């Protein structure tokens, strides 16, 4: 709390806060085993000591964030990985299309390769892409220019997809967008 007051007095315009540090990085971007809204209780305490806006991140759920904002405990909800999974997240919230949201599952399997865990961002190898972040649920993430996912097929086919898990549904969706007849 003293640090928050110090930063405000030093001229900071906003605090985007979580419980993470270099040694406890998982609090900054909580994995699946961390509870939803896991930083909320501590971050809302900042509003008691500062007058600048306070933003909370870390698997924030819109209903809980909205309640905290309405109560004056927060000024905004921080969103990061959720945009990798579903870039239209905010639009879908505004339009109340909750069942259309592709939720981040906090798996860390694809989005975190953009970090080396050495305290610096990595150099992205455009040719290889092995160090480039992706999303386990959204194959378009960071590949929008590399692959044309919506390009119509020159020859349409009947495609059978065996399995309706995440991968099967993604394959079926992309194949249908490309004009193929898909059976799951």
Predicted regions and their residues:
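Flavin-dependent oxidoreductase catalytic cores
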Residues: 1-162, 166-182
């Amino acid at each position: 709390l003293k640090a928050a007051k110090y930063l405000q007095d030093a001229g900071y315009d906003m605090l985007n806060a979580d419980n993470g540090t270099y040694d406890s990085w998982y609090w900054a971007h909580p994995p699946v085993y961390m509870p939803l809204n896991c930083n909320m209780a501590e971050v809302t305490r900042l509003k008691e000591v500062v007058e600048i806006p306070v933003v909370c991140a870390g698997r924030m759920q819109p209903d809980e964030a909205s309640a905290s904002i309405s109560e004056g405990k927060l000024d905004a909800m921080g969103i990061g990985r959720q945009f990798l999974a579903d870039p239209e997240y905010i639009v879908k919230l505004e339009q109340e299309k909750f069942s259309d949201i592709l939720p981040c599952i906090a798996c860390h399997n694809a989005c975190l390769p953009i970090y080396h865990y050495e305290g610096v961002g990595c150099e992205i190898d455009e040719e290889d892409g092995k160090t480039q972040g992706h999303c386990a649920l959204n194959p378009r993430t960071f590949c929008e220019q590399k692959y044309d996912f919506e390009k119509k097929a020159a020859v349409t086919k009947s495609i059978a997809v065996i399995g309706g898990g995440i991968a099967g549904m993604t394959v079926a969706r992309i194949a249908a967008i490309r004009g193929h007849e898909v059976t799951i």
